[in-house]
């Protein structure tokens, strides 16, 4: 009988202190969950900030690439029939003796020095 009383008293004490620890555990779990949500929120905010920075860098690079890809109008090289299109660089659109008599159109040639 004495052993049953001892075990019952231990059961009551364990239940009482177990409930107290459970309340503490619940508070600790709430704190842990809140900290995790804060960390997740901060990580998400950092990721969003990083994403915005990357988008800004990407837009500047795309602008530079668009500027680089925009080129002058196409031009014609040396000994190519010209007319509607301009000749490149220092070439001039002239009727020449060599090709002009055959095709009856001017050609892009280097300007003569004289």
From Swiss-Prot:
UniProt propeptide residues:
21-74
InterPro entries found in the cross-reference section: Toxin_22 (IPR012627)
Q: Look up the coiled coil feature and give its residue ranges.
A: none
- Keyword Chaperone tagged: no
Which UniProt keyword terms apply here? Cleavage on pair of basic residues, Disulfide bond, Ion channel impairing toxin, Knottin, Secreted, Signal, Toxin
Sorted alphabetically, the Gene Ontology cellular component annotations on this record are: extracellular region
| Free-text function comment from the UniProt entry | Ion channel inhibitor.
| Record remark on domains | The presence of a 'disulfide through disulfide knot' structurally defines this protein as a knottin.
What name does the UniProt record give this protein? Answer: U17-barytoxin-Tl1a
Q: What are the leading ranks of the lineage? A: Eukaryota, Metazoa, Ecdysozoa, Arthropoda, Chelicerata
């Amino acid at each position: 009988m004495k052993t049953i009383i001892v075990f019952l008293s231990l059961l009551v004490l364990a239940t009482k202190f177990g409930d107290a620890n459970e309340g503490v555990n619940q508070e600790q779990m709430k704190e842990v969950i809140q900290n995790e949500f804060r960390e997740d929120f901060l990580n998400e905010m950092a990721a969003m900030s990083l994403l915005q920075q990357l988008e800004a860098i990407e837009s500047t690079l795309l602008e530079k690439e668009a500027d680089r890809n925009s080129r002058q109008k196409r031009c014609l090289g040396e000994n190519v029939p010209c007319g509607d299109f301009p000749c490149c660089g220092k070439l001039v659109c002239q009727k020449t003796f060599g090709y002009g008599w055959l095709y009856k159109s001017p050609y892009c040639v280097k300007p003569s020095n004289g």
